[in-house]
Amino acid sequence: MILRIIIFVIIILVVSLLLIYFVNKKPIINTQIENYSDIKNKFKTGDIILFSCRKHNTFIDEIKYFSRTKLIGSEFGHVGLILRDKKKLYVIEFTDYEHPGDQVAKRYHDLGKGGMRVIELETALREYNKDHMGCYAVRFISQEIPNDIFYDKIKKHRHKIFESKPKLLLLAFIDMLVMHKMSSDLATIFHNEDRMTCGEFVHTVLNDCNAIADYPSKIFWPYIVEDSDFNKILRSDISYSRLVKFIFDP
């Protein structure tokens, strides 16, 4: 009986999500106001970069993406950090396995389960654009994080793997559509020192660098960076720019 109830609830949720998807699906208007080449010199260590996806491999992938982005009024589904080192720009990010550009990115283990990677920024933009036709956005940090501090804070995450996707989707669903407090409590219960999400990595590193304040890292979703309330979790001596959307023209 309990199993039937659970199955019924899942079916109702899936049907509801599909209805919301078809009712709200709209073509994304290209609203980028900058070109990458015009803002390239502004990037520095500690900037937060966001990625969106406009092309999906399957309808199921599109529904999953919709449920954690457009359903809550967001456009971006992935987040990473910028590193400027010796005039070169890199994205430091936590991704699943075979993320766009993985063939040229540097990873720190070969477990085949994703994790932290380093990739040149322009390569990441080019590969992401090729696979997903995405657009991008950045928040520029007011004061660059010294590279020695940045390296020290990211190195402890090198051998972790990407978080379980079912767990990730469950936390996202509860946080966005049910109750934030419940999701926060579950995130604490589910906490695993060996696994991370992209947002969790970004928040943990910036928090360790004293750039942003405490927040449940496991449920630090990309849309939070896009949200106007983002400034509420900044340290008093650090600020970030408004969200700057941009396109990359290879």
Curated annotation (Swiss-Prot):
Give the bilayer topology.
Single-pass membrane protein
| InterPro entries listed in its UniProt record | Papain-like_cys_pep_sf
**UniProt entry tagged with the keyword RNA-binding:** no
Q: What is this protein called?
A: Uncharacterized protein R372
Subcellular location as annotated: Membrane
- Segments traversing the membrane: 2-22
Per its UniProt record, what SUPFAM superfamilies does this chain match?
Cysteine proteinases
Species in which this protein is naturally found: Acanthamoeba polyphaga mimivirus (APMV)
Q: Which UniProt keywords apply?
A: Membrane, Transmembrane, Transmembrane helix
**Main location as per UniProt:** membrane
Looking at the UniProt record for this protein, which Gene Ontology cellular component terms does it annotate, in alphabetical order? membrane
